[in-house]
Amino acid sequence: MKTYPVQLEVAGPAAMWTRPDTGGAFTSYPAPTYSAAKGIFESIARLKSAYIRPIRVEVCRPLQFHRYATNYRGPLRKANQLKIDASYQLIAVILVDVCYRIYGSVEEATPSPVATNHLHALQEMFMRRVSKGQCFSVLALGWKEFTTSYWGPFRDNTQVESSLDLEVPSMLHSVFDKPISGNLNPRFVQHARIEKGVLSYAQ
């Protein structure tokens, strides 16, 4: 069976791959989750009948965690804060100076609505947009305020952080039960491992 691989390098001054188990004191995973990587791919190209399934991610800079604070003024503040129009201060532990190489494969979600090969069409659309620096929406490294300083083809001087070996006891994999138009059904992977700087995503 023919495969339709894609790949992308992303980098930025900050990233937040939020661990749900850290509650209100948000803390980042060391690498993007499956769903975060899928969202990055979809920021560049998407179809209703096909999607890009993340396969693995390579960590390309040393892990640096940093304390971060921001003022939240959205609708989820407490009633007394809303009443006096007060901000809620969010404290988080984020990653700084990050770089990743993400690999994926175009997969079918539903039968193609047209006679053309929609898997090849999505692959070509993705590769064309990456080469031209075009995207569907602004790429973010987790939180929307953490935009990229670079996204595009692999750069020759980027190196995998091969000294990095660690285990994440429980890591969010996906949020929905289907790759497209799914219902909320979070899935976690136990004992996810980053080995020689590489995190392979579960099927």
Residues covered by each model-derived region:
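Beta-strand elements of well-folded, non-transmembrane domains
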Residues: V10-A14, R61, I102-T110
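Residue-level signal for secondary-structure boundary sites
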Residues: M16-T18, F65, T110-S112
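Short, hydrophobic/aromatic beta-strand segments
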Residues: R19, Y51-R53, P113-A115
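N-terminal, Lys/Arg- and Ser/Thr-rich interaction peptides
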Residues: M1-G24, Q190-L199
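Short, surface-exposed loop/turn motifs at beta-strand boundaries within globular domains
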Residues: M1-T3, Y34, L95
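Extracellular structured ligand-interaction cores
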Residues: P5, P54, D97-R101
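Internal, well-folded beta-alpha domain core
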Residues: Y72-G74, A79-Q203
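Glycine/small-residue-rich interface belts in oligomeric ring/scaffold proteins
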Residues: T22, T27-T70
